[in-house]
C-alpha cells in the first residue's frame, strides 16, 4: 500500500510538472511570436510538419462547432510566387516555407449541420440545427461576420502553434483580393479573410513598436 501511495504521489507531481511546462511553453510562444518580414527561402517544411500544424489548427473554436473555416495550404513555389505578386510584391509568400490562406465558408451553417455534433445526442443535434437556421438563414451579414471571427481564432492558433514547433510566421492582409481569389479558385460562397506565411526567419523582426498601457485598453466591468 505504501508503495502504491508513493507511485500515486509521484504520478500527480509529474502531471503538475508537465502542466507547468506546457503553460510556460504557451507563455513563451505568445511573448516571442513576431511578424517576420524576411524568410529563409531555403527552408522547407515536410508534409508531416504541415499536417501536424493543421491538425492543431482545426481544433480552433467556431460558433456551434460549424467549422466554417477553409484553409488553402501552399508549398508549390510557382504558386507562392503568384501569391507574392498578388501581395503587391511582398516577398514573404515566395520566400516562406508555407502559405496558409484562411477562407470562410459562408454556407457551412446549412451543409449537413448534424455532422458538427455527430458525437452528441439526437436532441442536441436538432437543437444546433435549428439554432443555425435561426441565426444564419437569410442573414448574409451574420454569415460573413461569423466566418471572419472563426478565421481570426484559427489565425492565432496557426501562429502560436508554429512558434511552438520552432517556426516563424507573418499574418498578411495586404493583397489584391480578386487576384488571390483567382489563384486559389475561390468558390462564390467563400471569402478570403487573411493569409499567414510560415517558415524560418532569415533575420530577426524589428523591435516591438510598443504596447499601449493596460489602463487604456482594459476596463473592469464596463467602460
Regions found by a protein language model. Name each.
Residues 8-23:
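Short, Lys/Arg-enriched N-terminal segments with co-localized hydrophobic residues
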